[in-house]
């Protein structure tokens, strides 16, 4: 087990206390929390240009009339804040600069932070966390070779194309742009994972071969692959790390409900809108025009009013389409990040043997990396826009002891159990970071089985949990549930009122 000095815990604790995801951020930037009148909200870069609002998505900009927006709140977009935060601490000491770098890592800026980490290490070569982090960056910079993937590619049962990143090989059925976006996100996740554990003093292996992943265009092909691998237990999942192939498989959520049905409805609305446009264009100036779109009631307009009404409807359809696109990215890219953590845990030997970590810990840790905001990876241990509502809806959550003993896990995907796993790891990692690292260390230590009075896996984990966090589980459970009642996403914190 590592001592506090080896982990550099004082520096890390300074960073953690400053950066726990409370949602507070520098406000001196454009609006990034956007609340819409009819439905939905989004966290993404937005600028107001006269009567228009321009929203930035990963694949381009979307323009909307300002009147669809109920409220705008500036801030909460780390890429916009990074340069100013870095300038503010440029002349400060190593600890403060490291805290800012740690903020960047936990907010997904794992590419942007590299030069700052190297500067910190140059200023103080004895600063242990930054020394380990620059060392792992050097090792990550070494070229990777391709894995042997011919057999896996054939086993997929469909034609796929090959795309590569420095550490990722993706077999896909998508456009080059979509494949590149997915790979870029996964590369950020890989950097974040290795920087996180390097800072904490865990010496892990870095990829020597590109990590293999497959992305089906259609859910039915994903399900067919699972059946061919006798993995039907995972048929309710959107992605799966296959340990025998050492590869991730996932499918495009646009091929399945609710995305598929919602997109079909929007497409039908657009077709209706176009037909009404053509009708209005041909109508005499003084005519009265009846318009009915979708489930809306029939309304009668003059020609000028009809033109204005159709423009409003087009604006609403554009807004709905954008929100649907953001929902798709949140789930699909979040799944890709989640499964990448399982793959990295295996590749890096964080989990030396598959049964060393309980399922709740493996899934809860992977969920710390799956938050997507504005279509971009949001970083590590963020207040989870998808898991947090699931956790709040739990009617009968597992008692902490049963959860630690892995009760209910190991039978495929269970949304409620995974929400609890995310919430527990989120709490332990952010509120008890040193004990959490001790727990990880104990589980990775081969001698634990010999030291423990009982050897079955559930008891071994429970014993390690007690050593790390203490034996008063009732007190810890009360603290956990109390903490989770305070957790809010940035969008939740500012939802009330209007601007």
Question: What are these language model-derived features?
Answer:
Residues 2-12:
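Bacterial N-terminal signal peptides that target proteins for export
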Residues 10-21:
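Bacterial N-terminal signal peptides
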Residues 21-161, 169, 176, 184-188, ...:
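Compositionally biased alpha-helical segments
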Residues 39, 47-50, 58-60, 67-74, ...:
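Solvent-exposed coil/turn segments that connect beta secondary-structure elements
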Residues 52, 98-101, 114-117, 183-190, ...:
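Extracytoplasmic/secreted envelope proteins and their assembly/folding machinery
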Residues 72-77, 154-156, 232-248, 310, ...:
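Acidic/His/Gly-enriched intrinsically disordered linker/tail segments
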Residues 102-110, 118-126, 135-139, 191-202, ...:
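Sec-exported extracytoplasmic/periplasmic mature domains
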Residues 159-353, 358, 448, 460-461:
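Juxtacatalytic substrate-recognition/specificity segment
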């Amino acid at each position: 087990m590592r001592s506090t000095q080896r982990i550099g815990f004082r520096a890390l604790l300074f960073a953690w206390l400053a950066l726990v995801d409370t949602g507070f951020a520098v406000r001196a930037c454009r609006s990034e929390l956007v609340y819409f009148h009819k439905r939905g909200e989004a966290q993404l870069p937005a600028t107001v240009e006269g009567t228009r609002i321009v929203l930035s998505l990963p694949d381009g900009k979307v323009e909307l009339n300002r009147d669809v927006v109920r409220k705008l709140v500036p801030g909460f977009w780390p890429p916009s804040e990074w340069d100013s935060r870095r300038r503010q601490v440029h002349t400060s000491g190593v600890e403060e600069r490291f805290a800012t770098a740690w903020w960047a890592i936990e907010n997904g800026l794992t590419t942007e932070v590299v030069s700052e980490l190297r500067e910190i290490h140059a200023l103080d070569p004895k600063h242990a966390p930054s020394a380990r982090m620059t060392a792992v960056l050097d090792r990550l910079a070494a070229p990777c070779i391709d894995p042997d993937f011919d057999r896996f590619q054939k086993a997929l049962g469909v034609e796929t194309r090959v795309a590569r990143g420095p550490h990722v090989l993706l077999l896909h059925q998508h456009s080059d742009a979509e494949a590149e976006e997915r790979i870029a996100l996964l590369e950020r996740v890989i950097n974040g994972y290795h920087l996180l554990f390097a800072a904490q003093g865990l010496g892990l292996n870095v990829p020597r071969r590109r990590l293999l992943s497959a992305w089906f265009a259609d859910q039915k092909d994903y399900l067919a692959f699972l059946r061919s691998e006798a993995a039907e237990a995972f048929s309710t999942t959107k992605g799966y790390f296959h340990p025998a192939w050492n590869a991730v498989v996932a499918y495009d959520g646009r091929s399945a409900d609710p995305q598929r049905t919602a997109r079909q409805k929007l497409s039908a609305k657009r077709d209706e809108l176009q037909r009404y446009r053509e009708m209005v264009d041909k109508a005499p100036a003084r005519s009265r025009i009846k318009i009915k779109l979708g489930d809306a009631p029939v309304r009668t307009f003059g020609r000028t009013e009809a033109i204005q009404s159709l423009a409003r409807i087009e604006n609403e359809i554009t807004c709905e389409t954008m929100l649907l696109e953001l929902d798709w990215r949140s789930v699909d890219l979040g799944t890709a990040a989640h499964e990448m953590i399982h793959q990295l845990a295996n590749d890096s030997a964080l989990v030396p043997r598959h049964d060393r970590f309980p399922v709740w810990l493996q899934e809860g840790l992977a969920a710390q990396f799956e938050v997507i905001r504005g279509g971009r990876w949001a970083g590590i241990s963020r207040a989870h826009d998808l898991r947090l509502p699931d956790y709040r809806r739990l009617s009968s959550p597992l008692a902490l002891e049963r959860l630690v003993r892995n009760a209910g896990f190991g039978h495929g995907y269970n949304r409620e159990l995974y929400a609890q796993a995310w919430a527990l790891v989120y709490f332990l990692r952010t509120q008890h970071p040193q004990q959490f690292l001790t727990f990880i260390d104990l589980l990775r230590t081969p001698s634990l089985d010999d030291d423990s009075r009982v050897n079955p896996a559930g008891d071994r984990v429970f014993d390690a949990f007690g050593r790390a966090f203490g034996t008063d589980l009732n007190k810890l459970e009360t603290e956990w549930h109390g903490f989770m009642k305070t957790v809010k996403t940035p969008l939740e914190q500012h939802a009330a009122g209007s601007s």
